[in-house]
């Protein structure tokens, strides 16, 4: 399974999954249809599935046009998003599995950004290959999503689930927010040398127009403050020794950054 990253809107990423043996494709969070249709035409591939992580328009905005072009496509989303995702046919529960070609993804319930948010995790096929995590707006490179419908406690629980995946997991998040995220992270975790090193690398990449997605989960665990709420340095920075309160205070600071 090849993952093709497509830029969309101002800072979104759409992910096209392509199986070259069957020449079929699936798409994760089509913010708009045009980049997907263009890539499918180049591949001469058939779209068989739309995997939505949540209902926000910059993740589902392309659904209807893709359905019109490929009437047999199946549209997947969380069960709690029923009525909010255009064209949704499959209503996924936590722990469900979805298949694309010869790969099977686990559905992880990750409320916080929205009340119904899910992530799709394709485990590695061999010991020396990475798993693939499509996490929408729950976990970002260097950050996490705003809490529009969920609570800090829910988001901590959701991020704990994602944090427990193998460290070589590739994190396919839906926005190019990494530079600003890491600039904020350094403001609350200023003595983190791994973070400073990563920020310097990201500055160079972005100055050259290079994408910073995917990232690796192991790197996130070392540098992303929203996965590090137990760290004494971060707790000291926000004057809290409670994990949920620490997370909430860091999130509050980020909202104003």
Curated annotation (Swiss-Prot):
Binding-site residues, Zn(2+) 1: 54, 56, 113, 137
Pathway per the UniProt entry: Secondary metabolite metabolism; methylglyoxal degradation; (R)-lactate from methylglyoxal: step 2/2
Catalytic activity: an S-(2-hydroxyacyl)glutathione + H2O = a 2-hydroxy carboxylate + glutathione + H(+)
Keyword Lipoprotein: no
Coiled coil: none
SUPFAM superfamilies xref list: Metallo-hydrolase/oxidoreductase (SSF56281)
Listed cofactors: Zn(2+)
Record text on subunit structure and interactions: Monomer.
Protein purpose: Thiolesterase that catalyzes the hydrolysis of S-D-lactoyl-glutathione to form glutathione and D-lactic acid.
Name of the protein: Hydroxyacylglutathione hydrolase
């Amino acid at each position: 399974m090849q993952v093709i990253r497509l830029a969309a809107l101002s800072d979104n990423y759409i992910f096209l999954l392509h199986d070259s043996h069957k020449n079929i494709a699936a798409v994760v969070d089509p913010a708009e249809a045009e980049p997907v249709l263009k890539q499918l035409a180049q591949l001469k591939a058939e779209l068989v599935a739309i995997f939505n992580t949540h209902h926000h328009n910059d993740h589902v905005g392309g659904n209807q046009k893709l359905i019109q072009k490929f009437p047999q496509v199946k549209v997947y989303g969380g069960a709690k998003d029923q009525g909010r995702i255009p064209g949704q046919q499959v209503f996924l529960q936590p722990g469900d599995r979805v298949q694309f070609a010869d790969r099977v993804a686990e559905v992880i319930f990750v409320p916080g950004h929205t009340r119904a948010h899910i992530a799709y995790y394709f485990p590695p096929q061999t010991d020396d290959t990475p798993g693939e995590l499509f996490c929408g707006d729950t976990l970002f490179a260097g950050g996490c999503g705003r809490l529009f419908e969920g609570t800090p406690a829910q988001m901590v629980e959701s991020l704990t689930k994602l944090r427990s995946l193998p460290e070589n997991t590739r994190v396919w998040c839906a926005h190019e927010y990494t530079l600003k995220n890491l600039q904020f992270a350094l403001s609350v975790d200023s003595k983190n040398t791994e973070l400073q090193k990563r920020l310097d690398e990201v500055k160079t990449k972005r100055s050259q127009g290079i994408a910073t997605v995917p990232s690796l989960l192991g790197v996130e665990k070392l540098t992303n403050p929203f996965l590090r709420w137990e760290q004494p340095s971060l707790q000291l920075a926000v004057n809290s020794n409670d994990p949920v309160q620490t997370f909430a205070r860091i999130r509050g600071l980020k909202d104003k950054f």
